[in-house]
A protein has these predicted regions:
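Short, ordered, surface-exposed loop/turn motifs in non-cytosolic proteins
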Residues: 29-43
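Hydrophobic beta-strand segments
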Residues: 37-41, 68-69, 104
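Surface-exposed, low-complexity/disordered segments
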Residues: 88-338
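A short, amphipathic beta-strand motif
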Residues: 22-30, 54, 90, 102
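Short Pro-Gly-centered beta-turn/loop motif in secreted/extracellular proteins
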Residues: 57-65
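Short, acidic Ser/Thr/Gly-rich low-complexity loop/linker segments typical of extracellular
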Residues: 45-55
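Bacterial Sec-dependent N-terminal signal peptides
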Residues: 1-24
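A short, solvent-exposed loop/turn motif at the edges and junctions
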Residues: 69-80
C-alpha cells in the first residue's frame, strides 16, 4: 500500500473515531441508561438530547459554553461543567420524582377508552426555544382497534418569544406558534404495528418501566422545494413508556415523548435552519365508556384558555419554568380567554 493511501486510511479512521465519541448518561442509583436527558447551553439552547441508550454525541458539547444544565423528566438535574460532561460515562442523580400511577376509573369493557393526562409541546429553531404550550387533554381511543378517535384539550396556555418575527423570508426567526401540535399517540395501544414498517426500533427494560424507541427518517439525500422554500433531512423519534414487564397495552401506557426534526430555509437564506418539535404526554386517568363526549375547548393558538392553575400541581410537567429561567421577560404568555 502506498504511503499516501495509508495516510488517507489513517485520517479516515481517526475522524471516524473522533466523530463517534459519545457521552453516556447513567442512573446513579440503578446504573441503567437515562434516555431523554436534555442538555441546555448557558444561553438556553438545547444542544443535545440523549437516545434510548442514554447517549449524546460528544461533539455537541462546546467548551466555550463552560456550563450546561441537564433536564430530565421536566426537572433540572443541576449545572455541569464541560469537564464533568466530557467523559465516556456520566452518572446522574435522576430520582427526582416517582412515576405517578394512572388512576383507572372503570374496569368494565366499553366502546371507548378515554385517557386523560397532562401535556407539553415546544418548538426550537437552531436549538433555541421559539414557542411553548402545555395543558390538560383527553384522548379517546376505539377500544377495538386501539386507534385514536379524537384529541380533546380541556385547558392550555401558550408562550412565545418576543424576538420571533413574521418575515416569510427569515425561517430562522419565524414565529412557529401556529405549528404547535399535541402528541399524536399513534399506535401506543398497538406497539406491534411499528414492527411492520421500515422503522428502527429499540427497547430498554428499566427498573421502573419499559421503554420503546421508534426512529424514522426521510429526505436524507435530497431536498424538496416548494413556493420558494427548501425542506431537507426529516426525522422522527418516538419514545413510548409502559409499566414494567407489561403487555404494552393502553392500560399499561404511562408516557409518550415525540420529537420531529426538519431542516428548513427560504431560498434566499444561506443556511438551513434546524427546526425541532417536541411533544410529550403523561397519562393521569384511564376510563372505559360507551360515550365519547368529553370536556373540551377549541385549540386556538393565538390565545391561552384555562380556568385553573393546573401547572401548579406537583406532578405537572412544567417545562415553562425551565425555559423562563433562561429567557426571563422575553418569554410571553398569550392572553388567557377563559
Amino acid at each position: 500500500m502506498k504511503k499516501t493511501q495509508l495516510l488517507s486510511l489513517l485520517f479516515v479512521l481517526l475522524f471516524t473515531f473522533i466523530g463517534a465519541q459519545t457521552t453516556t448518561f447513567l442512573s446513579e442509583k440503578t446504573n441503567q441508561p437515562l434516555p431523554k436527558v436534555s442538555v441546555f447551553g448557558k444561553d438556553g439552547t438545547i444542544i443535545a438530547y440523549s437516545d434510548i441508550d442514554g447517549k449524546i454525541e460528544r461533539n455537541t458539547l462546546n467548551p466555550s459554553q463552560e456550563k450546561f444544565q441537564l433536564v430530565y423528566e421536566n426537572f433540572s438535574l443541576g449545572t455541569f461543567s464541560y469537564a464533568e460532561l466530557n467523559k465516556d460515562v456520566v452518572k446522574l442523580n435522576d430520582r427526582v420524582k416517582d412515576i405517578e400511577a394512572v388512576v383507572i376509573k372503570n374496569n368494565k369493557p366499553a366502546k371507548y377508552v378515554l385517557i386523560k393526562g397532562n401535556f407539553n409541546a415546544y418548538v426550537t429553531v437552531n436549538g433555541k426555544l421559539n414557542c411553548y404550550v402545555d395543558g390538560v387533554a383527553t384522548y379517546v381511543f376505539d377500544n377495538k382497534t386501539k386507534k385514536v378517535k379524537s384529541t380533546n384539550v380541556e385547558q392550555y396556555r401558550i408562550y412565545y418569544l418576543e424576538t420571533a418575527k413574521n418575515d416569510l423570508k427569515q425561517m430562522g426567526s419565524w414565529d412557529y406558534s401556529s405549528s404547535l401540535e399535541f402528541p399524536k399517540l399513534r399506535d401506543v395501544g398497538n406497539i406491534g404495528e411499528f414492527k411492520s414498517k421500515k422503522l428502527k426500533i429499540k427497547e430498554l427494560k428499566g427498573n421502573a418501566k419499559d421503554e420503546v424507541e421508534i426512529t424514522g427518517q426521510a429526505l436524507q439525500q435530497k431536498e424538496v422545494a416548494f413556493f420558494g422554500y427548501r425542506l431537507y433531512d426529516i426525522k422522527s423519534i418516538l419514545n413510548i413508556s409502559y409499566e414494567k414487564d407489561s403487555k404494552k397495552t393502553l392500560r399499561d401506557f404511562i408516557e409518550s415523548n415525540e420529537i420531529y426534526f426538519m431542516k428548513l430555509k427560504h431560498k434566499t437564506e444561506p443556511q438551513y435552519n434546524q427546526v425541532i418539535s417536541y411533544r410529550n404526554f403523561y397519562p393521569t386517568e384511564l376510563d372505559f365508556s360507551d360515550k365519547n363526549d368529553v370536556e373540551k375547548v377549541k385549540f386556538d393558538k393565538d390565545i391561552s384558555q384555562y380556568k385553573t392553575n393546573y401547572w401548579q400541581d406537583a406532578s405537572f410537567p412544567n417545562m415553562q419554568t425551565i425555559f423562563s429561567s433562561f429567557f426571563k421577560e422575553d418569554l410571553k404568555e398569550k392572553e388567557n380567554k377563559k
